[in-house]
Amino acid sequence: MAASLWVGPRGTINNYPGFNPSVDAEAIRKAIKGIGTDEKTLINILTERSNAQRQLIVKQYQEAYEQALKADLKGDLSGHFEHVMVALITAPAVFDAKQLKKSMRGMGTDEDTLIEILTTRTSRQMKEISQAYYTAYKKNLRDDISSETSGDFRKALLTLADGGRDESLKVDEHLAKKDAQTLYDAGEKKWGTDEDKFTEILCLRSFPQLKLTFDEYRNISQKDIEDSIKGELSGHFEDLLLAVVRCTRNTPAFLAGRLHQALKGAGTDEFTLNRIMVSRSEIDLLDIRREFKKHYGCSLYSAIQSDTSGDYRTVLLKICGGDD
């Protein structure tokens, strides 16, 4: 079953035992179609079922009522609450495809979102996302990235979008030494920087392999790779490579940083908040919570609590799954 690509050991949401899609579909129908919406029932059912189970509810709902659950939720709910509830019933690859489309639509491109999605998804996930993107928009993800970005940033994004990163857990010490030297020769050691070498190594090697490479890099250059990237590169390309380094070292910490960014300051970036909470809820949200507490001195739960309100707050806290 394809869903296993999207499930990890450290999620806050798991399969619901004794799951019965027709019972759930009926309860949801009642919650939507009664006088006034019973938000509590909707929240409880959708946050206590895995995405694979929600897909079965969507199917059952369509068969029983000849009505799309998504359309009914959209018709009945509104605002950020509606967005997160619709996200919950969307298959993961389709959800990511939509988020990528949204980040490239209209005036200006949301580079941070492109970087976040493309650096945190596995190669196999990227292949599914590209398929979902084509199915939804009849356009290649590659082509849209190409027309919305440029230069070395574009090249690196396309390399990631192709899903060519090695996924094996084997590490090759000789290759790590060689790559570390290549990075050093391409940056610190020469006048000007050979950006292609950075893209090739950072966007194609496996995370375990890169970890070893970064250790070797420090031995050769007496510098941390992050400092070299900051010194040698600039703009969105620099941001992307720094994100790769941070994900290599600790993906949950990188995503905790993104959540902190989304929650701090005057406004809340609900687009990012919804995306990370929903997309990591069955993968590593427990680890993200731990990193959030460690780095920012308060729990993710309390940060969400103080920054959101109403049913929107309730559903996010349910996904969060507990206070730390």
Swiss-Prot record:
Q: Which SUPFAM superfamilies match?
A: Annexin
Please give the Pfam families that the UniProt record associates with this protein.
Annexin
Record remark on domains: A pair of annexin repeats may form one binding site for calcium and phospholipid.
User: Gene Ontology terms, cellular component aspect?
Assistant: axon; cytoplasm; dendrite; membrane; neuronal cell body; nucleus; phagocytic vesicle membrane; plasma membrane
Q: Which family does it belong to?
A: Belongs to the annexin family.
Function, as annotated, reads:
Inhibitor of phospholipase A2, also possesses anti-coagulant properties.
Question: What are the alphabetically sorted keywords of the record?
Answer: Acetylation, Annexin, Calcium, Calcium/phospholipid-binding, Phospholipase A2 inhibitor, Phosphoprotein, Repeat
Q: Its Gene Ontology molecular function terms?
A: calcium ion binding; calcium-dependent phospholipid binding; calcium-dependent protein binding; phosphatidylserine binding; phospholipase A2 inhibitor activity
Q: Where are the Annexin repeats?
A: 19-90, 91-162, 174-246, 250-321
Q: What Gene3D superfamilies does the database record attribute to this sequence? A: Annexin
Organism of derivation: Rattus norvegicus
Tell me the protein's name: Annexin A3
InterPro entries, per this entry? Annexin, Annexin_repeat, Annexin_repeat_CS, Annexin_sf, ANX3
Q: Which parts of the sequence carry N6-acetyllysine?
A: K178
Disulfide partners: none
Per its UniProt entry, which superkingdom is the organism in? Eukaryota
- Modified positions (Phosphothreonine) in chain numbering: T268
Q: Choose any GO biological process term that the UniProt entry carries and state it.
A: positive regulation of endothelial cell migration
Q: Where are the transmembrane segments?
A: none
